[in-house]
Amino acid sequence: MTTSLPKSTIHRTVLNNGIVVLVTENPSADIVATRIFVRAGSCYENRTEAGLTYLLSAVLTKGCDNLSSLEIAEQIESVGASLSADTSADYFLLSLKTVTADFAEILRLAARILRNPTFPEAEVELEKRIALQDIRSQQEQPFSIAFEQLQQMIYQKHPYAMSALGDEFTMNRLKREDLVRYHQTYFRPDNIVISIAGRVTIADTIALVEEVFGDWHSLAEPPQPILNFPINVEPQHKATYKQTQQSIVMLGYLGASVISADYAALKLLSTYLGNGLSSRLFVELREKRGLAYDVSAFYPTRLFPASFVVYMGTAPENTKIAVAGLWAEVDLLCRNQLEEDALTAAKNKILGQYALGKQTNAQIAQIYGWYEILGLGIDFDRKFQEQIMAVSTADAIAAACQYLREPYVSLVGQEDAVTTAMPFPGHGV
């Protein structure tokens, strides 16, 4: 067993079997929150199995060795605890929250679920039907349609191209045996980070985790994600005709991963453009020009290069103007149109929101476990804030010129409105 950062408020330990344990002592409330991260997620799915990790998350808690779904639920609810599974592009997550007195009992239950799920056939089929309903529902939502076609243009054969749900074809193909195989492959101690925050002591918590998980061992080398990353950035446009009351206009760019030196600059640009009522897009395109029902920007934190997206919901007759307006606002960033005061405001906003996102035990357990599973280490909490503060206007403009040159364009709306908006004169699309 190796231990590091002994003076930190976050204590990091690596068990002999490879499990990383993070413990944060926070006695202010009689609550313990735990996040168990698995190095899995959609990046570890074959294209023909898209949705597999999502289905596994839905079925994982529906049965384990000698416990049915009902018995698991009763054990959790009898002490007022919570336990749930979720998945993302870069990791799988099991979350639990209890009062301190019940922490050991619920952690032992979580270990049984994580290590020995039974994946009952009836539960697999039920969750598949629910997932298929969700997929069909997404196919009726203009925003979801626009985002999915944007991701597919940007990422091509990379797993980020697909929705976490997959599609009807891939979800229909999935079987219980696929869940068993995936679980056996990726759910292994050297692929796991356990992050715990609350009214606990470091020594007792590590001893408990060692007792519960210490006899779990891996037999082979850990598997790697399935990348197939697009080699070339080749902006294009795509439209879906749909009888809607508004058009969805979405522009996307292939940005940088969280490990890139440009990550902080792109985070600030996204905040400047689309975070809140004072953001550039909201003020210029909604308040001043009245073009937008909804307008924003987002740039998620990803292990591999993330998409940088600006979007707007607008009246059908404004579709063409909306495309030009969004495009022009992003283009301005490459033309030195970013003031020092605006960048400072974006820094204050992002750091303020970041601080507010680390108040509860659940938030603390989440953020440090997330950084660890991405390979950033818990010190990224400090580094991220330093990186944000260090970004200059020249850095931000340089990042815009490198990553935000020409967008992929995704449109959803009435045929006449969308057709009028394409092609895009003067932009070479």
What are the roles of these predicted feature ranges?
Residues 28, 39-43, 416:
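Short active-site-proximal "capping" loops at secondary-structure junctions
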Residues 45, 49, 103, 107, ...:
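Short, charged, low-complexity patches
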